[in-house]
Amino acid sequence: MTESVLDYMTRLGRAARQASRVIARASTAQKNRALQAAADALDAARAELAAANEQDLAAGRANGLEPALLDRLALTPARIDGMITGLRQVASLPDPVGAIRDMSYRPSGIQVGKMRVPLGVIGIIYESRPNVTIDAASLCLKSGNATILRGGSEAIHSNRAIATCIQRGLAEAGLPAAVVQVVETTDREAVGALISMPEFVDVIVPRGGRGLIERISRDARVPVIKHLDGICHVYVAEHADLDKGWRVAFNAKTYRYGICGAMETLLVDQRVAEGFLPEMARRFQEKGVELRGCERTRALIEAKPASEDDWHTEYLDAILSIRVVDGLDQAIEHINHYGSHHTDSIITEHQGQARQFMAEVDSASVMLNTPTCFADGFEYGLGAEIGISTDKLHARGPVGLEGLTCEKYVVIGDGQLRGQESC
C-alpha cells in the first residue's frame, strides 16, 4: 500500500524529534566535524550536484520558468564554492548552546541564571534557491536543532543531492541522518502537514513570496518566524549632511534591488527637499531607477505620480517612491503606517532627532546614516542568518545561531527550603 503524504510527514516528524534529542547533546567538536565533513562531501560530489541541478533546470525550462527564477535555481561552480565556504564558516562560529549567563545569588542562597538551549525541531519552507538548503541545514545543525527542509518542487533533485552530502557529513561525525531531512515529495499537502505537527515540530521558518508566508502564518499550528515584506525607508531629515544623504540613499536602493533590505521609499524633509532632490534624482536616473513621487516631489523633479499603493509596495526592482514630508513626526508616522517593520534609516547630524527616530520607529532594525541594505546577519556579525524576522516574538531582525536557540532557567541550591531559613 502506498504511504500517504500525512503518514510520510508523520514519519519524518517522528524521526526528527528523536534526532533532535541526539543533536541537542552533541559536542561543539562533533557538530563542527559534521559540518566540515559535509563540506568535503559537497566538494567531492560536484558532478552529482551538477547533474541533479541540470534535471531541475531542464524541467524549469520545459515548464516556462522565468529567466530570473532559472538563475536563482542554478548551482554554478561559484555557488557550489559558496556553499562549501558557508559550511566551513558556520563551523568556525561560536556555539551558543550551553552558554550560561546572569548567574547570581538570591537572598535565599540559591543561584539563578539562564542557559541557552536548542529549540528542538525546525521546519524550513522555501522556494527556488537550492543553496538555502545548505544555509538552513548548517545553522540548524550548529545550533543543536534537527530540521525538516521543504524546498520548492522546481529544485527537488538539487535539494536531494545536497541533503545526501549533508547526511554523509552527519554519518562521519556519528550523528543520525534524521538531524537533516529533506521532504522528497512535491505534493503540496506536505506543507500543510509540516505546519500542523506541534508534537514533532517546534517552529516553522518560511522563506519565499508573500502568498506562501501569508498562508503559513494563517494556517500553522506551530510558531512561525517570518517577515512578509521589506518595505524599507530612508528619511533625509532637516539636519542631514546632503552629500552623506545622496550616497547612503543611492546605496540603499541600488546595492541589490531584489533583497528585502533595499530601500523602497525615500522620505525627504521639506526644508532640504529643494537642495537634495534634484541631485538625488539625477543619480538615480543615470542608474535607470524609475522614480514615483508625491505632488511636492514632482514640483522639484521629474517623476511619475505616486499612488497610495506605491507606499505599500515592496518593488524588489529599479523603482523608488519619494515623498516630501513636513518633518520628523510625519516621517515616523508614514513609516509606522506604511512600512513592514523591517529596516528604516534616518540621515541626520542632529543626535536628538536620531534618538527620537530610533525610539519611535517600530521596526526590527533602525539605523542612523546607514543604508538599509546593511540589514543582514553577516553584516551584523552573526556570521550567517536563516532569515529576517519582523515579529516581536521570539526573534526580531536577522536570525542567526542564537535566534535558533532559547533560554531556560538554571537554579543551583544546596538544600535550601522555601519558607524556611537556610540551614
Swiss-Prot record:
GO terms for biological process: L-proline biosynthetic process. Keywords: Amino-acid biosynthesis, Cytoplasm, NADP, Oxidoreductase, Proline biosynthesis. Gene3D superfamilies: Aldehyde Dehydrogenase, Chain A, domain 1, Aldehyde Dehydrogenase, Chain A, domain 2. This is Gamma-glutamyl phosphate reductase. Catalyzes the NADPH-dependent reduction of L-glutamate 5-phosphate into L-glutamate 5-semialdehyde and phosphate. The product spontaneously undergoes cyclization to form 1-pyrroline-5-carboxylate. Pathway: Amino-acid biosynthesis; L-proline biosynthesis; L-glutamate 5-semialdehyde from L-glutamate: step 2/2. Its main location: cytoplasm. The gene is proA. The keyword Nucleus does not apply. Belongs to the gamma-glutamyl phosphate reductase family.
